[in-house]
Design a protein with these regions (language model features):
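C-terminal, well-structured catalytic/ligand-binding subdomain of enzymes
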Residues: 1-75, 85-86, 102-107, 111-328
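Short, glycine/charge-rich beta-strand/loop segments that flank catalytic centers
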Residues: 78-98
């Protein structure tokens, strides 16, 4: 079952409320990764401080949100920061995104996959009501910044995220990808979101599927450092965890090694087609033995989200049974 939470106030306030809400889980997860975090802090402290200074200039309020989470959960702030700096801890995730546009349907579907050792209580659907007037909803792994999975805001922008193999982590002095994605969901239009991603340089890479539910448009955006590729989607599209845009794939495809990503992309292609209706996609993505995965895959689908662009609603499926319905 997916837990729901509403947080209100300043960035520090919402962080504190999230930290208090998920205190037990945050402590368990940090304890699990304590040795990794301590090693990184000892060996890469100067780089961490340099990155924090860059974030302090670019988006200081996000650091305040992390301080709030740390205080609410009563844990070490540095550990919370490292949890939101996956480039320096060399951590990553894996998900699947599908978009189908045909005579009947226009929708985005996204599987949120995480390691099977995690439990559902680690996640929550959080409604953010910030003091500055921003409003958005985000499916959050407790202790992380919003919009690393899927989110939608008051401007009608829906966003889902797929980790991409990073190619240029030599310079970690820019925005970590979690910070970039948190800033992205605050954008007031699809145009602003695209411009933001083009101007910003992050430490690694992400794939963003952005849907404008008001104007019925969708784009796929791949990022790697300072390079951005934008692709307008008009019919059928799917993505896992490696670059597939021509701007990147011709250069990097043969060098990539990202676990099950290519296999899952092929499975996704074999399971779905452009004429599928929403019911078929839901059945494919939410059924344990049909979702895009390969044998011995340790990842589990914790939630599947469907953003119906025509009807402007969000359906979130969990454990084949629970369904949460929201407007976007």
């Amino acid at each position: 079952m997916i837990r729901e939470l509403t947080v209100t106030g300043s960035y520090f306030d919402v962080g504190y409320q999230i930290g208090s809400f998920g205190r037990k889980i945050i402590k368990q997860l940090l304890q699990k990764n304590r040795k990794i975090f301590e090693t990184v802090l000892n060996k890469k402290r100067l780089q961490i401080e340099k990155t924090q200074k860059f974030i302090q200039k670019k988006a200081p309020y996000l650091l305040e949100e992390l301080r709030g989470i740390a205080m609410g959960a009563k844990v070490n702030y540095n550990f919370i920061f490292l949890r939101n700096f996956p480039e320096i801890t060399n951590s990553s995730g894996g998900c699947t995104t599908v978009l189908i546009k045909n005579k009947k349907d226009f929708f985005v579907a996204h599987n949120e996959d995480e390691d099977d050792s995690l439990i559902n209580e680690n996640f929550a659907l959080i409604q953010f009501n910030l003091k500055n007037g921003l409003r958005y909803n985000s499916f959050v792994l407790i202790g992380e910044l919003p919009n690393n999975a899927f989110s939608w805001n008051m401007a009608g922008i829906f966003c889902c995220v797929d980790t991409i193999v990073p190619f240029n982590c030599d310079n970690l002095s820019y925005l970590p990808r979690y910070f970039e994605s948190a800033l992205l969901i605050e954008q007031a239009s699809l145009k602003n979101a695209i411009q933001f991603l083009k101007k910003n340089r992050n430490c690694s890479g992400f794939h963003y599927l952005l849907a404008d539910t008001l104007n019925k448009k969708a784009v796929s955006i791949e990022k790697s450092g300072k390079t951005t590729s934008v692709k307008k989607i008009n019919n059928f599209f799917y993505h896992t965890n490696h670059h597939i845009h021509n701007k990147f794939s011709k250069k990097y495809t043969n060098k990539e090694n990202f676990g099950t990503s290519k296999a899952r992309l092929a499975i996704c292609a074999s399971l779905l087609n452009k004429n599928d209706y929403q019911e078929q996609v839901i059945k494919t993505l939410t059924t344990k033995f049909k979702r895009p995965f390969i044998k011995n895959d340790s990842r589990k689908t914790f939630a599947t989200v469907i953003c119906d662009i025509n009807k402007k609603n969000i359906k979130i499926f969990n454990d084949d049974e629970d369904v949460i319905l929201k407007k976007c």
